[in-house]
Amino acid sequence: MEAKGGTVKAASGFNATEDAQTLRKAMKGLGTDEDAIIGILAYRNTAQRQEIRSAYKSTIGRDLIEDLKSELSSNFEQVILGLMTPTVLYDVQELRRAMKGAGTDEGCLIEILASRTPEEIRRINQTYQQQYGRSLEEDICSDTSFMFQRVLVSLSAAGRDEGNYLDDALMKQDAQELYEAGEKRWGTDEVKFLSILCSRNRNHLLHVFDEYKRISQKDIEQSIKSETSGSFEDALLAIVKCMRSKPSYFAERLYKSMKGLGTDDNTLIRVMVSRAEIDMLDIRASFKRLYGKSLYSFIKGDTSGDYRKVLLVLCGGDD
């Protein structure tokens, strides 16, 4: 399948100073023109939004982020501030939010660390250290435990082979070792699962999954479900899903954030904001294929007001 890409593109005829003036006007005086804010920020890409922020400061003498914070609230504010945050910094802030205070948002940690490329994870590590004066790994270790901690540390080390090379003998050996680490024995050698799933390249792993099915008569996902549990299981499944298809993985994250009663707004916002420029069109196609309904219709039915408006713009259309 040819990748379709994102819904948010660079605006043509872009003028940062004009945009800055429009935003100021939308927030000056009584009330706020939310439509004007959406009309600009949801229709510019990340780089352009940074230029608008600079222009706002140099021509108006105020900080755009501070103004947005004082004018907006709740989920709508969270989306707009997310759009205003440079990509890597956004991931870093989400990882920090997932670990700060009581409780841990395991789903967020898994989603970011399992889906980003090694290069992105290296940048996340650098930025995390700059922002908080300690390493991402330190925070993971103080906030999580056991095998779940180990898989997150392994993913955060960005040690995955980035090549495309396939060594047939090693591929067969990996499949056999996974089989022997789980299905074939009583108990599970969890470290074996971790080391293979966190270090091999995507092409290699896809072949390992096929070979695994051939020798065990089971999908690797089925084995992970029966052999592991809790957040460790969730992390391994996320790695496998991201290797098979990132758009399908994110479609599932979105579906789960909205199905049933209530909405997991943090997940909905994070996926919509972080994937809008990358693969939102592919996510939409996967969503429709997997769930028989469009992502657009799900968002429309699950959200309201300006929050709904801005998410639908990021979604980019109905299917």
UniProtKB/Swiss-Prot annotation:
Transmembrane segments: none annotated. It is found in: Zymogen granule membrane. SUPFAM superfamilies: Annexin. One of its GO terms (cellular component) is collagen-containing extracellular matrix. Gene3D superfamilies: Annexin. The modification Phosphoserine is found at residue 12. It is a peripheral membrane protein. Annexin repeats lie at residues 14-85, 86-157, 169-241, 245-316. One of its GO terms (molecular function) is NF-kappaB binding. Keywords: Acetylation, Annexin, Calcium, Calcium/phospholipid-binding, Cytoplasmic vesicle, Membrane, Phosphoprotein, Repeat. It comes from the Eukaryota. InterPro entries: Annexin, Annexin_repeat, Annexin_repeat_CS, Annexin_sf, ANX4. The modification Phosphothreonine is found at residue 7. Pfam families: Annexin. The modification N6-acetyllysine is found at residues 213, 293, 300. The keyword Calcium applies. GO terms for biological process: epithelial cell differentiation; kidney development; negative regulation of interleukin-8 production; Notch signaling pathway; regulation of transcription by RNA polymerase II. Seems to bind one calcium ion with high affinity. Calcium/phospholipid-binding protein which promotes membrane fusion and is involved in exocytosis. A pair of annexin repeats may form one binding site for calcium and phospholipid. Belongs to the annexin family. This is Annexin A4. It comes from Mus musculus (Mouse).
